[in-house]
Amino acid sequence: MAAVAAVAARRRRSWASLVLAFLGVCLGITLAVDRSNFKTCEESSFCKRQRSIRPGLSPYRALLDSLQLGPDSLTVHLIHEVTKVLLVLELQGLQKNMTRFRIDELEPRRPRYRVPDVLVADPPIARLSVSGRDENSVELTMAEGPYKIILTARPFRLDLLEDRSLLLSVNARGLLEFEHQRAPRVSQGSKDPAEGDGAQPEETPRDGDKPEETQGKAEKDEPGAWEETFKTHSDSKPYGPMSVGLDFSLPGMEHVYGIPEHADNLRLKVTEGGEPYRLYNLDVFQYELYNPMALYGSVPVLLAHNPHRDLGIFWLNAAETWVDISSNTAGKTLFGKMMDYLQGSGETPQTDVRWMSETGIIDVFLLLGPSISDVFRQYASLTGTQALPPLFSLGYHQSRWNYRDEADVLEVDQGFDDHNLPCDVIWLDIEHADGKRYFTWDPSRFPQPRTMLERLASKRRKLVAIVDPHIKVDSGYRVHEELRNLGLYVKTRDGSDYEGWCWPGSAGYPDFTNPTMRAWWANMFSYDNYEGSAPNLFVWNDMNEPSVFNGPEVTMLKDAQHYGGWEHRDVHNIYGLYVHMATADGLRQRSGGMERPFVLARAFFAGSQRFGAVWTGDNTAEWDHLKISIPMCLSLGLVGLSFCGADVGGFFKNPEPELLVRWYQMGAYQPFFRAHAHLDTGRREPWLLPSQHNDIIRDALGQRYSLLPFWYTLLYQAHREGIPVMRPLWVQYPQDVTTFNIDDQYLLGDALLVHPVSDSGAHGVQVYLPGQGEVWYDIQSYQKHHGPQTLYLPVTLSSIPVFQRGGTIVPRWMRVRRSSECMKDDPITLFVALSPQGTAQGELFLDDGHTFNYQTRQEFLLRRFSFSGNTLVSSSADPEGHFETPIWIERVVIIGAGKPAAVVLQTKGSPESRLSFQHDPETSVLVLRKPGINVASDWSIHLR
């Protein structure tokens, strides 16, 4: 959905002129992103204050006499040498090669927000012990692994080592800045603090404060500390400045990734002299590319990679956050006392990372790898893995704003059948609801929604309807009345219901940080409450940043009040996660906990992967937007959000046929595959294109559906282990420096390499095939190429450059039907691509495709296929799973094989049987026809 500047084009109903006039005055109407509507660091007072602090000796000192070491953690006080304010550092060793530390005020005037509901559990502890000590430092040893932590007292600093190698330093540049809470000055005292949890700022210093010592530079209240104005919006700050900042130094690291969401390259850029990367969930109309502006979601996780090591930093803070990246060269002289702990000589490259958040505490997890797969598992152990989606959601989704009415929906449904195109889901945008009242249907356009859903169900198709988290203020609207009467809306500073302007006009915003609100919302998806809904109706949560058309930066006022007395500034980036969570819970509960939900959300945070899919938002029908979808989804996958996609064709503008074809080809090889379009664009259903383009799109859809068993297995692996589905090349080839900057091609699992064509009029692409000693097979021609090399590959409009790695086995369905549900019992064909050593392996996950029985009743199959010594073996990769299925093995295609004299099938309890085969000597492809064995059975095929 588009934001403020899209309103002029989007509103065609009676209130359109009011919205347009109002928003035109407030924010201005433009044809692209208006940067003036969004803050720079200079315009964000806390970012400006934090960034004004330059590297140097830290004013903080650790009071080693206060150190206490317990079974779960170490605590020590930190003192600011100027203000004499005390902080407390809590340090924990964690199992699985992780460390956590938290810094908070020792005696806060008011508790600071600690982010709940992101961690799936309290991480298990690996005890710390003191292994050395002198007058200015303490050496700690972790119970797991060869790790030591050096706590230096003056200036305060942490260094984390593996054996005698320095991995990471904290506050090495002296940029720790913790704005402690204080009483407002007399000149600032005219404003009363907001009603919250009852804690009121005092008007006099705390006991022990020394006024003459609190008037130094660190105590000066700079502009914006107690009140801030941006454009026409005033932000009261009743609790004063409360920002936190800290630096991390990563010696040996030159390549860092993560901290999505940004429309930028995969590798993070140095931000010195420019804008930091911003993490603040915002509805950005027609966002620009290749800059660090905030977008719809925020995941405060940064990954660092070199050929020998991977590390992660997880900054658990839900407030507005800025991240500075700088490049350095660290010689031994930089480390001072750390000389004693370092080996080698000379200088080493270094990346420095600086985090700055408006409120909250400093809560950091250090993920120590050592490999990137270890980092993925470590992060997944903290925040959970990608939810296993229902099979249908991996098919093709047809959407636009908006399908007009029931007849239009059913015509689109029939169009896919008439043109022999597969499709699983049709989508409805905001116009389907009665006056933008969510959980309702427009009675003139959708008078019989259940009948429409039944018609789709008869075709084994689904419907997704939008349910946004803003509620029309209307006394006759049951949803609004209940929320108001129950007191479940976000409040203003004075305690009244917060109202903003969005699609329905004046709207209330449910307080999803309140567990009672989330339970109420989940209950709204029951079939009784959501009238006209049915089991094949699923949900789209748009605008959940939250988007407020007349709010500052198109979002909510920061001094709005949430459950527990917290301000919106404390919880902003987690709001969208809570919407996603409550909706997914609702879809799960409506089936009695049996059915897996499908929910697409635009805003997200760390942990959102547990609740469904995300997409890259309101993109544009331009070639650069096609290109940028690759690094955007790769970045999301690196931080756990594997189920990602981009609007095929671009949301804004009308794509030329070539661009639309190329987008379908790319979308077919990205996890979430949905075409979507703006209200004012032309209709884009594939059959409306000239026949030559329609045929190419049909082929792209066919490739997607053929690979559904492979996609489903990849999503299960992401769900089980936390590894991304769509991977940068360096994840699989961590020592190949050439791969570290590549973001125009990617891997699906470890088997397929995809290089989409993303340039207009392209006649060829440069494909990098990685891996010393690897071979790669073109999946269409079976031509073999050796790695590592850069290959020029000629392309036509019908080309999708995809290669299968030698050494992998990919399962496919070869009969493309109208939807995935129509294919789920079809036989499997195995594509076995042999390595130079004549080996290959792969997996296949199967279950019923839609319930939680794979979890609750162990009803699933995970089969492992292995080829070596001219023998293909099928065995169980997880003996705990059991699932009866009619699926059988129809064919085996072995790529890179010689011609055997005979092929023999062996199954337990049955005599050997010979299989017919066909061999093509030009392509070295051997096809084994109709082994006819159930996919759940153990068997072996021998080439003799």
Curated annotation (Swiss-Prot):
Inhibited by deoxynojirimycin. PROSITE patterns: GLYCOSYL_HYDROL_F31_1, GLYCOSYL_HYDROL_F31_2. Its EC number is 3.2.1.207. It catalyses: N(4)-(alpha-D-Glc-(1->3)-alpha-D-Man-(1->2)-alpha-D-Man-(1->2)-alpha-D-Man-(1->3)-[alpha-D-Man-(1->2)-alpha-D-Man-(1->3)-[alpha-D-Man-(1->2)-alpha-D-Man-(1->6)]-alpha-D-Man-(1->6)]-beta-D-Man-(1->4)-beta-D-GlcNAc-(1->4)-beta-D-GlcNAc)-L-asparaginyl-[protein] + H2O = N(4)-(alpha-D-Man-(1->2)-alpha-D-Man-(1->2)-alpha-D-Man-(1->3)-[alpha-D-Man-(1->2)-alpha-D-Man-(1->3)-[alpha-D-Man-(1->2)-alpha-D-Man-(1->6)]-alpha-D-Man-(1->6)]-beta-D-Man-(1->4)-beta-D-GlcNAc-(1->4)-beta-D-GlcNAc)-L-asparaginyl-[protein] (N-glucan mannose isomer 9A1,2,3B1,2,3) + beta-D-glucose; N(4)-(alpha-D-Glc-(1->3)-alpha-D-Glc-(1->3)-alpha-D-Man-(1->2)-alpha-D-Man-(1->2)-alpha-D-Man-(1->3)-[alpha-D-Man-(1->2)-alpha-D-Man-(1->3)-[alpha-D-Man-(1->2)-alpha-D-Man-(1->6)]-alpha-D-Man-(1->6)]-beta-D-Man-(1->4)-beta-D-GlcNAc-(1->4)-beta-D-GlcNAc)-L-asparaginyl-[protein] + H2O = N(4)-(alpha-D-Glc-(1->3)-alpha-D-Man-(1->2)-alpha-D-Man-(1->2)-alpha-D-Man-(1->3)-[alpha-D-Man-(1->2)-alpha-D-Man-(1->3)-[alpha-D-Man-(1->2)-alpha-D-Man-(1->6)]-alpha-D-Man-(1->6)]-beta-D-Man-(1->4)-beta-D-GlcNAc-(1->4)-beta-D-GlcNAc)-L-asparaginyl-[protein] + beta-D-glucose. One of its GO terms (molecular function) is alpha-glucosidase activity. It is found in: Endoplasmic reticulum; Golgi apparatus; Melanosome. The keyword Signal applies. Heterodimer of a catalytic alpha subunit (GANAB) and a beta subunit (PRKCSH). Binds glycosylated PTPRC. Belongs to the glycosyl hydrolase 31 family. PANTHER family: ALPHA-GLUCOSIDASE, NEUTRAL ALPHA-GLUCOSIDASE AB. It is linked to Polycystic kidney disease 3 with or without polycystic liver disease: A form of polycystic kidney disease, a disorder characterized by progressive formation and enlargement of cysts in both kidneys, typically leading to end-stage renal disease in adult life. Cysts also occur in other organs, particularly the liver. PKD3 inheritance is autosomal dominant. Catalytic subunit of glucosidase II that cleaves sequentially the 2 innermost alpha-1,3-linked glucose residues from the Glc(2)Man(9)GlcNAc(2) oligosaccharide precursor of immature glycoproteins. Required for PKD1/Polycystin-1 and PKD2/Polycystin-2 maturation and localization to the cell surface and cilia. This is Neutral alpha-glucosidase AB. The lineage of its organism: Eukaryota, Metazoa, Chordata, Craniata, Vertebrata. The gene is GANAB.
